[in-house]
Swiss-Prot record:
Transmembrane segments: 126-145
Record keyword Transmembrane present: yes
GO cellular component: plasma membrane
Protein name: Glycosyl-4,4'-diaponeurosporenoate acyltransferase
Molecular functions per Gene Ontology: acyltransferase activity
GO biological process terms held by the UniProt record: carotenoid biosynthetic process
Presence of keyword Endoplasmic reticulum: no
Organism this protein belongs to: Staphylococcus aureus (strain bovine RF122 / ET3-1)
EC number: 2.3.1.-
InterPro entries noted in UniProt: CrtO
Chief location: membrane
């Protein structure tokens, strides 16, 4: 019985830890100026093996499950609400590209706090590593899948004469 109480207590504290840490990381991430994400950073580059996002769909079937991911705006009102994308124009698409970069960065950073469990019991460590990966990697994959497609759409819009000022 003591062991069960200990596990329940540990699970509760781990859950609270992740809730507080991830909400704070997301909140801080929304405060990073857009100009940071307009620059070309290597971490946001689409690599050759990704084949403009096709790799992610071929190996992870992104199109089949990406719509099931909770929209971050439902948890944090500072996160870009994709539902307000009413018109497809270069300004809106550029904003979406910026937000894919922001989301990817936030979710990479959200994995890092798992190091606090490094000295903990093996089971606690493994469960928290699993949680950190399951909660963040799918979102990173979706961003890496969507961004090249949005970038291509932006190029098409600009080529057709719609200019972004």
């Amino acid at each position: 019985m003591k062991t069960m109480k200990k596990y329940i207590k540990t699970a509760f504290f781990c859950s609270m830890y992740w809730l507080i840490v991830q909400l704070n990381i997301a909140n801080l991430g929304t405060r990073i100026p857009d100009k940071y994400f307009r620059q070309k950073h290597i971490i946001f580059k689409s690599f050759n093996f990704e084949k403009h996002g096709k790799f992610w769909n071929k190996w992870f079937y992104v199109r089949k499950w990406k719509h099931k991911i909770l929209d971050g705006h439902q948890l944090n009102r500072n996160i870009y609400d994709q539902r307000h994308l009413m018109t497809i124009n270069s300004d809106e698409i550029e904003k979406m590209i910026i937000e894919t970069k922001r989301a990817e960065l936030i979710h990479w950073i959200s994995i890092l706090p798992v190091i606090i469990f490094n000295k903990g019991p093996r089971l606690v460590k493994y469960i928290n590593i699993f949680y950190a990966m399951i909660a963040n990697v799918p979102i990173i994959i979706v961003q890496r899948y969507n961004r090249p497609r949005l970038t291509q759409l932006l190029r098409i819009l600009k080529r057709r004469g719609e200019r972004h000022d």
